[in-house]
Structure formats: C-alpha cells, structure tokens
Amino acid sequence: MKTMTQMRKPHVLLHSTKTMQAVAPRLQTDTSIDGGPYVQRGSTQNFVVSYEGSLGADGQTFADAVLAVCEQDYTFLQSVFGNISIQGLPFQVYLRLGDSNNGGAYHYSCDATALYCFITPGEPTELASMLVVAEEDEVFMANQNVGWNCGYSNGEGLSRVLATELHPSALNGFASAASWLDSNRPDWVDNTEQTDTDYVSIGCATLFLNYLRYQLGMNWSNIVQAGGDTLAQTYSNLTGASDAFSPFATLLQSRFPQGTPSGLQNDNPFPIG
C-alpha cells in the first residue's frame, strides 16, 4: 500500500513585485535549513540571528538592526496576544540574500519558529525587523489558536498591520490596501480567502483591521484577542453587531470612489471624516 507523502507549503510575506523563486514546499519530515552557509551574529533571550555569508558586511548591519529591537518587539506582541506562552523558542532568524526574484519572508508552518527573511543590500535596515515581526506574529497566532490563520487572508492581514505598527517606515513594497481599493472590492470581511498571497483579499484585511483600530478606536490587544474565522466574527466579538462590511465599505467609498485609482501608498487612510 502506498503512503501519501505530506508536503508543507511555506507561509509567506510576499513582496508586491517580487516572487520567491528560491522557496518551495518541502516534506513534513524535512527539518533542514534553507540557504546558507550562515554566520551567527548574535542572540538574545528569545532570538538567535544569523545571516548568509554572501551578505557580507550588509548581513552584519541587518542582523544588528534586528538584534537591537527584537526583544522590544516581542514584548509588544506578548502584550497584544494576552501574554500567551510560545512553543519552540528561541526564534531562529535567518537573513537570506534577496534579489529581483526573491523578496519578503517565510516560515514552513504557522507555528514554525525558524524565520527566513530576504534582504537586498541597499534596502532600509528596518526592513529586516519588519519582516521578522510579520513572521513572528504568525507564530503567536498559531499558539493563540482563536481563528487567526497565517495562511488565510485574515491572519495575513493581521501579520502585516502588527509589523507595520512597529516598523511603519518599512512598508514600501508591501502595502496592499490599494490592491483592494482599485479592484471590484469583494467582501473579504464576511469571508476569508484561504491564501496568504492574494493582495486583494490581504488589502481588504489590512484596511479593515486599521479601520477597527484607527476609525473605531479599538486597541490592538482587544482586536487580536477577539479573533475569529472571519474579520466579521472578530467585529462581532468586539461590538456584538453583525453588519461589519457595509459601514466599512461605505466609508471608504466616500474617500476613494470605486473605479478611480486610489493612489493610496500605505494601508491606513484612517480616520476618515
């Protein structure tokens, strides 16, 4: 009798103009390290940070930038996720050499604490920290287990807004809101798309989460701890109301009329009005 071989698809933070040609699904049993050889630059209580030797001095610079803030960022995530315990620590951060075909970050399961971040020399050093947070917070989601799925649009949206909250200047190339505003604006609030690579559904998610935070005035801790299988469920958990999408879409229509290019270069146009 043949045994089905199970594969793990990487969960990714995809750059808007780059692919990940160097990344592919792997066997469930494969625990090897992608890329390398690596140079370990340093460690903290919850992180070990290494860079590909091919990055040279740039690798040291980016690794040092991560080491300088990673514990501070971890403390923020611990707070908003309700001080839950995280399994599999420390995080192993691997900074890989990026190029025009490889950008963003990934890990091989939502709870995987080996985090890979593509870095291209010349990019802002804060980018590395933003990428780490975007993958790290997905591990928090998996350990929390209240509905945020790192491979679905709701979890990918949360991943991005929390990373941007901590590192707003590093969003360039990862902003997704305009992709939804400039589309036919499907309802990815009442529905969740089962992918983390569609910029339209991700854009809807980042907009809605920022709407909760910066239009309705809810704090990140309450939002994160009110997770559900859809963003509408999160809204209902927070407010007791069921009409999540319509007021949100109507408000955005007032600022960004559908059919007209939005021109929005970040994920947070709020507050509006």
Listing of model-derived features with the role each one plays in the protein:
Residues 1-136, 140-150:
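Zn2+-dependent metallopeptidase catalytic core
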Residues 24, 229-273:
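Beta/coil-rich, acidic/histidine-enriched accessory regions frequently appended to metallopeptidases
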Residues 62, 66-73, 128-136, 154-158, ...:
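Stable alpha-helical elements in mature extracytoplasmic
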Residues 69-84, 139-143, 162-165, 169, ...:
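Structured segments of extracytoplasmic/periplasmic soluble domains
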Residues 73, 149-199, 210, 217:
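Post-HExxH zinc-binding segment in Zn-dependent metallohydrolases
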Residues 97-99, 225-231:
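Short, solvent-exposed aromatic-acidic interface loops
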Residues 100-104, 166-172, 232-234:
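Secretory-pathway/luminal and periplasmic proteins that interact with or process carbohydrate-rich
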